[in-house]
Amino acid sequence: MNPSEMQRKAPPRRRRHRNRAPLTHKMNKMVTSEEQMKLPSTKKAEPPTWAQLKKLTQLATKYLENTKVTQTPESMLLAALMIVSMVSAGVLNSSEETATIENGP
């Protein structure tokens, strides 16, 4: 190897960040309306009933008991979100979910 090949190349210079203000101005000019936000696949859902909320709370409590997790407001919220996401994703339907949670994993 000759000495010129042994020399290290200088790292490439970093480009300066451009001013982001023009992007902010573009966002301010954007107009969003409800017609633009609604997609054909969007479905209207009714608010949950008190009975549904009570059932969700019971299922979350059972799940936490079965997994031996301390029942705190945070863990209850996470358990409820886990149950809702699994049902909405179609992983479990509500009757399978109830049986699984009540009988243990």
Curated annotation (Swiss-Prot):
A motif (Nuclear localization signal) lies at residues 13-20. It comes from the Eukaryota. Residues 10-20 have a biased composition (Basic residues). GO terms for molecular function: RNA binding. Pfam families: HERV-K_REC. A motif (Nuclear export signal) lies at residues 50-59. One of its GO terms (biological process) is mRNA transport. Keywords: Cytoplasm, ERV, mRNA transport, Nucleus, RNA-binding, Transport, Transposable element. Residues 1-48 are annotated as: Disordered. Despite functional similarity, Rec shares almost no sequence homology with HIV-1 Rev and HTLV-1 Rex. Retroviral replication requires the nuclear export and translation of unspliced, singly-spliced and multiply-spliced derivatives of the initial genomic transcript. Rec interacts with a highly structured RNA element (RcRE) present in the viral 3'LTR and recruits the cellular nuclear export machinery. This permits export to the cytoplasm of unspliced genomic or incompletely spliced subgenomic viral transcripts. This is Endogenous retrovirus group K member 8 Rec protein. It comes from Homo sapiens. The gene is ERVK-8.
